[in-house]
Amino acid sequence: MGFLFTSESVNEGHPDKLADQISDGILDACLEQDPDSKVACETATKTNMVMVFGEITTKAKVDYEAVVRQVCRDVGFISNETGLDGNNCRVLVELHDQSPDIGQGVHGMGTKSLEEIGAGDQGHMFGYATDETPELMPLTHVLATKLGHRLTVVRKDGTCPWVLPDGKTQVTIEYENEGGAMIPKRVHTILISTQHIEGVSNEKIAEDLMNEVIKKVVPEKYLDADTIFHLNPSGRFVIGGPDGDAGLTGRKIIIDTYGGWGAHGGGAFSGKDPTKVDRSGAYIARQVAKSIVAAGLARRALFQISYAIGVAQPLSIHVDTYGSGKIPDSEILEKVKEKFDFRAGMIGKSLDLKRGGNKRYQTTAAYGHFGRDDTDVFTWEKVVPL
């Protein structure tokens, strides 16, 4: 019997996503000059204001205000009409050194080797993969994410000049469960809410969203006469970005990962250097799950890993293939143990996570951290043979 499942996404102009990108833009700037930077950078934004705050220990010389303004411009916040004027808004900076109590426990204030470096905090992280898409990601999440990205493309290339930076998408798909594997049958509902300029008609909005966004993204085989479309259902979305809603780093963790599939340990990614296992642990967990499915060992896989602050080795690892495995989960776990080094410091080395700059981490902060094509940036998307 079929069932419905829904995933949502938000654009890079959503205030929470702007905050994520600013935090990761600052991480990039620090790592580019000093790969051993310790960064825990949060961002908050509201009307005409951006604040960055947290703990950073680095040898890098970074103009934090300049980074904030450049990220705002990159997204498209260039005037009050867009929701934030990145050139003239207030920028508040409250960044201080990492606590020495944390530093001595995690990296010995720089004296520990990579093999000895402990996890930056306690926590449990999950990786997920499914064979329902080429990306080995859930189709609900893939389509919601691609619709949001397409909204940004048509805004920036002029195809739909009435589109402004803020926006949200949501996709509901009818699935069937086939021996633990997820089989998408049809798209049940598509919801798009996009910020727009004053004066554009709802009819024009709906027409362009259908022709220039939905039909360019969603495969025709998933659409039918019964598919439901809600296109800017509120009727008006002129006030957006930080002018419409406050934004804060780390509030879109399900959008960042698997759209509600699998599981989530609760830790956000953006603004955190590789010693923070909230990020690095989740990245290698995705690589494990993806490698399991790519190897044909299972059609769907969930991998969990957990850590204690200051301890290099994980406390536990776990594999669940939802009954879709070709061999027992216990045997898959043994294969994983043979191929992966889960020590906190070694994850950063194997995935090249100390490499910042060129907007590497800023790029991860919008449109999902997983299922991305560029494995030079998204190194955790490389499959490890099992």
Curated annotation (Swiss-Prot):
Pfam families: S-AdoMet_synt_C (PF02773), S-AdoMet_synt_M (PF02772), S-AdoMet_synt_N (PF00438). Keywords: ATP-binding, Cobalt, Cytoplasm, Magnesium, Metal-binding, Nucleotide-binding, One-carbon metabolism, Potassium, Transferase. It comes from the Eukaryota. Its EC number is 2.5.1.6. GO terms for molecular function: ATP binding; metal ion binding; methionine adenosyltransferase activity. The keyword Nuclease does not apply. Binds 2 divalent ions per subunit. The metal ions interact primarily with the substrate. Can utilize magnesium, manganese or cobalt (in vitro). Binds 1 potassium ion per subunit. The potassium ion interacts primarily with the substrate. It catalyses: L-methionine + ATP + H2O = S-adenosyl-L-methionine + phosphate + diphosphate. It is found in: Cytoplasm. Mg(2+) binds at residue 8. InterPro entries: ADOMET_SYNTHASE_CS, S-AdoMet_synt_C, S-AdoMet_synt_central, S-AdoMet_synt_N, S-AdoMet_synthetase, S-AdoMet_synthetase_sfam. Coiled coil: none annotated. ATP binds at residues 14, 166-168, 234-237, 245, 251-252, 268, 272, 276. Pathway: Amino-acid biosynthesis; S-adenosyl-L-methionine biosynthesis; S-adenosyl-L-methionine from L-methionine: step 1/1. Its cofactor is Mn(2+); Mg(2+); Co(2+); K(+). L-methionine binds at residues 55, 98, 245, 276. Its main location: cytoplasm. CDD domains: S-AdoMet_synt. K(+) binds at residue 42. Belongs to the AdoMet synthase family. Catalyzes the formation of S-adenosylmethionine from methionine and ATP. The reaction comprises two steps that are both catalyzed by the same enzyme: formation of S-adenosylmethionine (AdoMet) and triphosphate, and subsequent hydrolysis of the triphosphate. PANTHER family: S-ADENOSYLMETHIONINE SYNTHETASE. Homotetramer. This is S-adenosylmethionine synthase. It comes from Ostreococcus tauri. The lineage of its organism: Eukaryota, Viridiplantae, Chlorophyta, Mamiellophyceae, Mamiellales.
